Amino acid sequence: MNTLHIFDSVKKEKVEFKPIQEGKVKIYVCGPTVYDDSHLGHARSAIAFDLLHRVLKVNDYEVTMTKNFTDIDDKIIKKMYETNKTLENITNQYINAYKADMKALNILDNTIEPKATENLEVMKEMISNLISKDVAYKTSDSVYFDTSKDNLYGTLSHKSNDENSQARVEENQEKRNSADFALWKFEKANDVSFDAPFGKGRPGWHIECSAMIEKHLAYKDSPYQIDIHAGGADLLFPHHENEAAQTRCSSGQNLAKYWMHNGFVNINGEKMSKSLGNSFFLKDVLKSYSGEVIRFYLMSTHYRADLSFNEEDLIASKKRLDKIYRLKKRVYGIEDSSVNKKFKEDILNALNDDINTSIALSVIDEMINSANDKLDSNPKDKNLKKELISNINFIEEVLGIGGNDAYAYFQFGINESTKEKIESLILKRNEAKKTKDFQTADKLRDELSSMDISLMDTVNGTVWEKL
């Protein structure tokens, strides 16, 4: 196995990744709260840790990738009453929409996708355990976690108790400490609630993830329950800090050996989020750009750095991706052989250095430029073509781009009825050329050109692409 280095949020530095169990990796990524459609911020987090998943697999690790769905939350309940829909109708709608978006981005399937509402019993058990240890206590409105009972509280986010207190928004005069947070919210009018030994209500946000990790992933004989816990930088505090505290005090284990966080997507200098009302829904961006172009754009900046959304950069990313597919067209129909050793090493060296996609994509740019020069000099070199298609297949394996049909890629955004019209005009043009009616053939080409369709006459027939 190659040596992978990742940036650990606790140590605030790059460290060598060493799994808890040899050859196996357990990862938990905080998934969406399913009350609305996904935006580019969700896409960025998904792509960042999909890249981690792919790099680990290429390094021969067996990966258990888990991403949850928060399907019980204040925002979901608010949506219920706004739309007069059931909780299940809303959450299923947005879970399905999220999965469709992830498919468009070529995100590898998760091993486990737990829902909060399907794991209530383990949440109740954890809360009961914390109450029995006097680490949690009841007030009139909730069961709270007592942050003063955890000496390590704040060590993940590197915040002092004063900073933690100022950052909290849960104000209740019955709380022992201003930083204490709700584990279980007691039933209110027009609320969704579940029976529990400590009172009818519903779980707080933080306990959900701790409980799902405990149930589905946790090593029992290790100081750490899982290898990597990941999510957006906005989750570092309070969400991940609170998760870590709950698990420490409940099980005596550390939640994760490593913590990883991706940067924001910013709009006009502010983090993109639904609550701020400045988010670009992924489904809307997908109307103009393929998921593959969006993927390329979002991984062109290192995952830890903030990214300022700019459509000009999105267009530039498409042009770079176009070059991969133009090369793929030049080696179309060739069987692969083996990846160029130096190319593979250069890509892996970049990605094993904390998933450095910027360098990896630069290596690809250089390979494409060199390949085109070689093909220009010797267009019939089959061994070269076999190596190049192997290189492109490796790019898809480790970066998730370049795996689609080269001709279909350049036809993105054309609906079926328009495709039928284009194919019909091409057939008419071909017939006109056969009968040497070049005037008609030229008129048909001009008509297609007015539709922003470019034609290329090849030995295998006429192919077209959208300009």
Curated annotation (Swiss-Prot):
**List of residues binding ATP:** 274
Motif 'KMSKS' region: chain residues:
271-275
Q: Which cofactor does it need?
A: Zn(2+)
Q: Where does Zn(2+) bind?
A: 30, 209, 239, 243
Q: What is its EC number?
A: 6.1.1.16
Q: What SMART domains does the record point to?
A: DALR_2 (SM00840)
Pfam families hit by this protein: DALR_2, tRNA-synt_1e
Kindly state which reaction or reactions the protein catalyses.
tRNA(Cys) + L-cysteine + ATP = L-cysteinyl-tRNA(Cys) + AMP + diphosphate
Assembly and binders = Monomer.
Q: What is this protein called?
A: Cysteine--tRNA ligase
Specify the species.
Answer: Aliarcobacter butzleri (strain RM4018)
Q: Name the gene that codes for it.
A: cysS
